[in-house]
Amino acid sequence: MLVIAVENVPPRLRGRLSLWLAEVRAGVYVGVYSAAIRARIWDDVRKLIGSGSAVMVWSAATDSGFDFETIGANRREPVDFDGLTLVRFLPPASEDRVPP
């Protein structure tokens, strides 16, 4: 199973995703593909994302049963915690903030 959710992306990316996946709700696409096809679809997302954001989730042989990847401004980051995938919420980017 493969799920891609997008926000604030250009119409051409939505159209491209609709070629491969079923849009079950606005911005949420679902399908079943191999790892190779999944990588090709994600490459299209990377190229066409613009200023939007996206998350791709797929079935995987892990303790949690899934894995995911994110791209864009509203990023959350996957973190491996002893074989279990957890989500790290990244702080908002700020010009005033000094990196640690």
What are the language-model segments listed below?
Residues 1-5, 9-100:
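Basic nucleic-acid-binding interfaces
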